[in-house]
Every structure is written in structure tokens, then in C-alpha cells.
Amino acid sequence: MTKVRVRGIYATALTKIMLEDGYDIVQATDTILSRFNILHSTEPPDVTIKDDENIPGALFIIGKCSEVNKVLESILRRVGDVAYNKPPVPLYSVIMGVVADNGHIEVAPGVLALLEGSNYFRPGDKLPVTMVNVTGQLRASPYIMPTTSYLRVIDSPTVRLSRHIKDPDAKMMLVRVGLSKINQLGGLGIRWRSSAQYLSEEDAEKALDEAISLVNAIRVKIAEARDYDMLFEGECIVSVILDAEARWVLDDIRNTIVPTVKGHHALKITMKNTEILDYTEYLVGELKMRDELGRALANYALSNLSTINVHHVKVNGEHINLGPGERVHYSNGLLIIRRELKPGGTLDGLNVAKEYGDAAYSVINIGERHLTHIYVSHDGSFKGAYVNINTPIEVTWDGVIYIDLEVDLTVDKGFNVNIIDEDKLSSIPSRRLINEAEEELSRLKGDVVNLVRNHIDTLSKLGLSIHYQGP
């Protein structure tokens, strides 16, 4: 049976999904053990699910490739058709690459990675490399550095430990075992993974012996390897870009285990101290007012922020913080923030120069599938508007978050409408999100001028005088 370790803000909901689909939960936290009444297992996981450190609100799945795909399918069956990204090659895979120009190596047809130490090799050379980074810019090392359940081979003759290994006795034992055999790795070293903290000294020695044998076996394969042959599979990675609807599903699943407000997981994306959330959910258990208390907590979060972060997440995982911006208004789900723009360049989609004193007012309705940026000059003249189409806007503890859906509309100062990046819709890796973007675009494009004018009127009523020309 596949063994899964679950960590992060979605742990309770994901543990329930994994258990329902027959996976074994290993290395669970005390909270998860208590909530699900399961036995503690220290076995190493085949797959780990955790928060993605680079993409706010996303899941990061890593482990044995065949098992990662199964776990991904289990999650998608519950949360629906969401965007996810898989690197072209596994992490720590060992591949017979072909050295290319400009410091790169081709590790699969058309797939280039930066080659560490590229000055020592010539274009056309065949070279076994280990993929040491597969998210963002691919990077390959000319050292043979496979990974196992308990350790990873590294490119310097040292013994290192995962930061998750806390026990002093375990640390001393693992260092001792590592140093006793490190000379058998031919100039390489090891980094013990967190699962190694549960090993006895005898089992740690066996784990290291197996890693040494693995390195030697890979070296034997090199002589007969062809271009792009994978000499060691490594670990597959998937980043799952969760949007509001997926998070709401996970809120509901968690609510079957412990009282959970709607919006729980969005709030926790940037929440460091969960005491107020815990107390609110205690009240949910007592008063059964789940939706009302969830809205109240979201209102509390936004009402108490003087600056707002706008987490603009793209379907490829790129994260852009459009803040922090000054909160100038929040009431009944309507949030308005102000950002001063740096002079230089042009306003997105409008081809209008950004000048000294320009500002952007972002008009954000929580739960809506778009938000509008109103651009004004130093004297309050309307310079244009940019309407971003996105997934429903959610409240985080430090602002708001949404997934950008590529296509947008602009309205210039003469109230002429332009659709931009419509051709990028097909690049979204989710049919559901494409359909939602097309529906929102269709709904907006006939009414976007009225939408922008209404927003300008709203800003004027708040004392933010904005003037424009035109009918």
C-alpha cells in the first residue's frame, strides 16, 4: 500500500481523502493521529504532500513517480479540474545528457538545463547529470547524486542532516554512521533525510550501504547509456494550483472532521498565529453559524489591515504581489486599495506612459471573478482602467488572493474597450478554468464601460475626486 506523509495547512482535509482512498498515513503529527484515531508509523513515505513554498496556497506533491500520479488523481477527484504543473524531468533523476551551447545541457529532446561547471565540457559531449532543480530554471550537476528514502547523495564529501531531525542522539548516530562509510562514495557525501531520524544504527548502516551500491550501479550503466537515457528515476514533483472553489471543497471536507469556517484554508495561507481562527471555529462548533462566522472573520481580517497584499497567482505558479497597497475603503465585501506608481514604462495594456504622481485604485469585490484597476494622474485625471479576469477572490490574513486567468480587458481614457491576451486562454491547464474565463469575459465585455464608470463614481463618493472626458 502506498505510504503518504501529509503536512501543511490542508493536512486534515487531505488526510481524510488519503484514508478514504486506502493510502497509509505515515509520520503523522499528533493532531492528525488524534483526529483520525490512527496508529503512529515511522516508515518513510512513498509520497509527501505539503504546502508549496514558492506558490501561495498551492500543494506540493513529491515522491515515487507512479505513486505521485495516483495521489494526484485522488486529490483531483475531490477538488475538481484545477491547474497543476509537472516539471519535464524528475528531481534528482540521473540522465545521460548532451552538452549544448551557452552553459546548457540537453536532458531530453528540446529540454535544456543549466549545467554546473559547464566550462569543463564541450558542446556535443555526452555526460551523466543529476537534476538538482526542476522547478523554474532547470539545473543539472555533473555528479552522480541519487536519492533514497533515507538519504540523498551530495556533491561534497561531508555528512549533513535534514533540519527536521531534532533529536541530539539521532543526529550523533547518523553523523557517526555517515563518516564511517563516506570514503566509499568516491568524493561524494550524504545528506540524511528526515525519515532517517527513526532508524536504528544498524538500519542506518544498511541504508547507507544501499545508497553506495546504487551509486555504483548507476556508474556501471553509464558505459552503455544512450542520449537522454534515464539512469535513475529520482522523484516526481507536482505543484497543484488550488483556486477558491477547490479550497472551498477542502473547507467542507475538513468540516466533516472538525468545525471549519468557509474560507479557513485561504485565511491560513498567510496566517502565522491561528489563535483567533481556532477560537472562531470553536464558536462554529458551539453555535453552528459556520457561514456567518466565516464572513465575520474575513471582515475582521480586512478591516484591521492598513495595507493590503494582493496575491496574484498565475496558472504556471508564478506569484506576483500587487501590494502592499493602502486600504482606503472596506465595507460589505467591497475593498478599495491605492498604490502609487513609479514613473517610467507604460500602464499595462494601455500603452500610456506612467508619470510622476500616477496612482492605481484597485476595486475588489470579494468573491467576484474580476477586479478593476483605475489609473489616475497626479491631478485626478482618469488615464484608463485594467479589468483582470480571475478565479473568485478570497480573503487571506494579509489581503486577498486569486488565480489569474490570462485574458483581460482595458478601457482607455476615451472609454474604448480592448481585449488583451485572449490567445493565452488555451494555455491554461484546466478546461474548467478556461470555461470560467470565457464566461466572465462574455459577461463583462458588453458592460465593462458601465462597470468602470460606476467604480469611478464610487471613488468620487469616497472623496477621491476623479475626472474624465467623454459621454
Curated annotation (Swiss-Prot):
The GO terms this record gives for MF are: mRNA 3'-UTR AU-rich region binding; RNA endonuclease activity, producing 5'-phosphomonoesters
Q: In the record, which residues are listed under signal peptide? A: none
**GO-annotated biological processes:** rRNA processing
Please tell me the species this chain comes from.
Answer: Caldivirga maquilingensis (strain ATCC 700844 / DSM 13496 / JCM 10307 / IC-167)
- Keyword tRNA processing appears in the UniProt entry: no
Q: Which family does it belong to?
A: Belongs to the FAU-1 family.
Record flagged with keyword Glycoprotein:
no
Alphabetically list the UniProt keywords. Endonuclease, Hydrolase, Nuclease, RNA-binding, rRNA processing
* Name of the protein in question: Probable ribonuclease FAU-1
Its biological function? Answer: Probable RNase involved in rRNA stability through maturation and/or degradation of precursor rRNAs. Binds to RNA in loop regions with AU-rich sequences.
Give the Enzyme Commission number.
Answer: 3.1.26.-
- Identify the taxonomic lineage of the organism of origin: Archaea, Thermoproteota, Thermoprotei, Thermoproteales, Thermoproteaceae
InterPro entries linked to this entry? DUF402, FomD-like_sf, Ntdp-like, RNA-bd_FAU-1
